[in-house]
Design a protein with these regions (language model features):
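Acidic, Mg2+-coordinating phosphoryl-transfer loop and its flanking beta/alpha structural elements
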Residues: 128-154
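Glycine-rich phosphate-binding loop signature in dinucleotide/nucleotide-binding domains
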Residues: 2-4, 115-125
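Short helix-capping segments at alpha-helix termini
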Residues: 81-87, 120
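Anion (oxyanion) recognition and catalysis
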Residues: 42-46, 82, 140
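Short, electropositive alpha-helical surface patch
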Residues: 63-78, 102-117
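Active-site neighborhood of HAD-like aspartate-dependent phosphohydrolases
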Residues: 2-52
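Short acidic capping loops at alpha-helix termini that bridge into adjacent secondary structure
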Residues: 88-90, 123-126
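Substrate-recognition element of Asp-dependent hydrolases with the DxDx(T/V) motif
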Residues: 37, 41-74, 87-100
Length: 154
């Protein structure tokens, strides 16, 4: 692997990095990290992984918050990760509800295709291979990192 290549892990946001809510995360104040998630991302960063977030954010289409609020939430998340020594290389989101016929809402592959196209266009940190770990369970994230550690990849 050259210095311009790194493995990529793709994480969901709500329920993996931060606590989820049936009422949606509608402001930066409502975004609360799950214990250990920021440190796990920092550990992946230090091991040379690129970390991306792929998240459904139907609250936009529902009118619960706008794109500026979503960016503020993501800035808070990225700053919190940075404070622990980690980095999120990109955040990709679908703003649609499940009733909208779109290809970007997970589990449809559109969001991952957008992410892949973006990653392929980067000249400084081009992933050499991808490990889609788009999940909504903290335990799955921790198990994935544990497995990577056992294989010497994190």
């Amino acid at each position: 692997m050259t210095s311009t290549q790194s493995p990529l892990i793709i994480l969901d946001r709500d329920g993996v990095i931060n606590h989820d809510s049936d009422r949606y995360i509608k402001s930066p104040d409502e975004w609360l990290p799950i214990e250990g998630s920021l440190e796990a991302i920092a550990r992946l960063t230090h091991a040379g992984w690129s970390v991306a977030v792929a998240t459904n954010q139907s609250g936009i289409e529902r009118g619960l918050f706008d794109i500026n609020v979503l960016h503020a939430i993501h800035n808070k998340m990225m700053n919190a990760v940075a404070e622990k020594g980690g980095r999120i290389d990109g955040v990709f989101f679908c703003p649609h509800t499940a009733n909208t016929a779109c290809s970007c809402r997970k589990p449809s592959p559109g969001l991952l295709k957008i992410l892949a196209a973006d990653s392929a266009g980067r000249s400084t940190r081009r992933p050499s291979w991808a490990t889609p770990c788009v999940t909504s369970r903290r335990e799955q994230l921790l198990n994935a990192i544990s497995g990577l550690l056992r294989r010497g990849r994190a």
